[in-house]
């Protein structure tokens, strides 16, 4: 049986990215909560070299 986590930066950004969060009301609430908590990263950010 193959493992469930098959990492891909594309699908990661498409489902958990900042623009996707901002697109819906509930997504904006997620960002709001993370701002209030003082998170350094509000949404998934793919590291670049």
Swiss-Prot record:
<keyword id="KW-0689">Ribosomal protein</keyword>
<keyword id="KW-0687">Ribonucleoprotein</keyword>
<dbReference type="InterPro" id="IPR020939">
    <property type="entry name" value="Ribosomal_bL34_CS"/>
</dbReference>
<comment type="similarity">
    <text>Belongs to the bacterial ribosomal protein bL34 family.</text>
</comment>
<dbReference type="Pfam" id="PF00468">
    <property type="entry name" value="Ribosomal_L34"/>
</dbReference>
<dbReference type="GO" id="GO:0006412">
    <property type="term" value="P:translation"/>
</dbReference>
<dbReference type="GO" id="GO:1990904">
    <property type="term" value="C:ribonucleoprotein complex"/>
</dbReference>
<dbReference type="GO" id="GO:0005840">
    <property type="term" value="C:ribosome"/>
</dbReference>
<dbReference type="GO" id="GO:0003735">
    <property type="term" value="F:structural constituent of ribosome"/>
</dbReference>
<protein>
    <recommendedName>
        <fullName>Large ribosomal subunit protein bL34</fullName>
    </recommendedName>
</protein>
<dbReference type="InterPro" id="IPR000271">
    <property type="entry name" value="Ribosomal_bL34"/>
</dbReference>
């Amino acid at each position: 049986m193959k493992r469930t986590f098959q990492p891909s930066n594309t699908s990661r950004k498409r489902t958990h990215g900042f623009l996707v969060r901002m697109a819906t009301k509930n997504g904006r609430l997620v960002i709001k909560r993370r701002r209030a908590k003082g998170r350094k990263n509000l949404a998934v950010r793919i590291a670049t070299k």
